[in-house]
UniProtKB/Swiss-Prot annotation:
Source species taxonomy: Bacteria, Pseudomonadati, Pseudomonadota, Gammaproteobacteria, Alteromonadales
Name of the gene this protein is made from: folD
Family: Belongs to the tetrahydrofolate dehydrogenase/cyclohydrolase family.
InterPro entries attached to this UniProt entry: Aminoacid_DH-like_N_sf, NAD(P)-bd_dom_sf, THF_DH/CycHdrlase, THF_DH/CycHdrlase_cat_dom, THF_DH/CycHdrlase_CS, THF_DH/CycHdrlase_NAD-bd_dom
Keyword Amino-acid biosynthesis assigned: yes
Organism name: Alteromonas mediterranea (strain DSM 17117 / CIP 110805 / LMG 28347 / Deep ecotype)
Entry GO terms, CC: cytosol
Protein name: Bifunctional protein FolD
Complexes and interactors: Homodimer.
Record bears the keyword Transcription: no
Pathway recorded for this protein: One-carbon metabolism; tetrahydrofolate interconversion
């Protein structure tokens, strides 16, 4: 058996096309376009690539994209003042502060300063709390994108054993809330988990987000499982690989995401969806 590939690039393209059509209808009706403010502090190379992709996606769907590139020695007060200004700006529907922030800046404080209705990354405690209470508003982008990918398989997930490897605030923890909401029986594995192999082997749905190349051996994967690989790691030969041993896993899984071209494009697509949702729900 060879797994079906879940093509994140294709699904993300479909999402962008849907958003573009909606924005076109707004323009034709004489209404303003949704606006996204993207704030980058410092010159981290990876962050610059991520921000560039997000700005490009905004332009593609017809959003107004405002860029704020600040030096690495920016003070916390300056950054918080900028967030306050963007919170008050009626042309801006979403605010994205690219992480990680340089040393000396409190990311938690900055993210909590963003108004929950403009928190298109979905990281604000208000939005995480809404998800936990089963009344989601703006949802964290990567888990939201993963749910869209899972839905594309057409496999019903209610009652499935779902195992998440990794318990970060960005992916693992909100992913567990998403899968609970979808009706899965959810296990979250972390650095203190004992006998990781036994958990992975029983997973009908496996999400791995640890940032370690080929961390999960492919022969651990349950036959027919849905495998979502969030990791993207550059190895010694310069190639990009995920957190799961793809070559072996694809021979056992029913569906699997490639790396690259899997989860990454869907994270950006979900950001675009969230910005449109913020516009429609809160600011139009």
């Amino acid at each position: 058996m060879t797994a079906h590939l879940i093509d994140g690039k294709l699904i993300a393209k479909q999402v962008r096309q849907h958003v573009t059509s909606y924005v076109d209808s707004l323009t034709q009706a004489g209404k303003r376009q949704p606006g996204l403010a993207v704030v980058l502090v410092g010159s981290d190379a990876a962050s610059q690539v991520y921000v560039s992709n997000k700005r490009k996606a905004c332009d593609e769907v017809g959003f107004v994209s405002r860029s704020f590139d600040l030096p690495s020695d920016t003070t916390e007060e300056t950054l918080l003042n900028l967030v306050d200004q963007l919170n008050e700006d009626k042309e801006i529907d979403g605010i994205l502060v690219q992480l990680p922030l340089p040393a000396g800046l409190n990311a938690e404080k900055v993210l909590e300063r963003i108004h929950p209705h403009k928190d298109v990354d979905g990281f604000h405690p208000y939005n995480i709390g809404r998800l936990a209470q089963r009344i989601p508003a703006l949802r964290p982008c990567t888990p939201k994108g993963i749910m869209t990918m899972i839905e594309s398989t057409k496999r019903p997930v209610k009652g499935l054993d779902a195992v998440i490897v990794g318990a970060s605030n960005i992916v693992g923890r909100p992913m567990s809330l998403e899968l609970l909401l979808a009706g899965c029986t959810v296990t979250t594995c972390h650095k203190f988990t004992q006998d990781l192999k036994s958990h992975v082997q029983r997973a009908d749905l496996l999400v791995v987000a640890v940032g370690k190349p080929n961390f999960i051996p492919g022969d651990w994967v349950k036959p027919g499982a849905i495998v979502i690989d969030v990791g993207i790691n550059r190895v010694n030969d310069g190639s990009l690989v995920g957190d799961v041993d793809f070559d072996k896993a694809k021979e056992r899984a029913g569906w699997i995401t490639p790396v690259p071209g899997g989860v990454g494009p869907m994270t950006v697509a979900s950001l675009i969806e969230n910005t449109l949702e913020a516009y429609v729900k809160y600011h139009s």
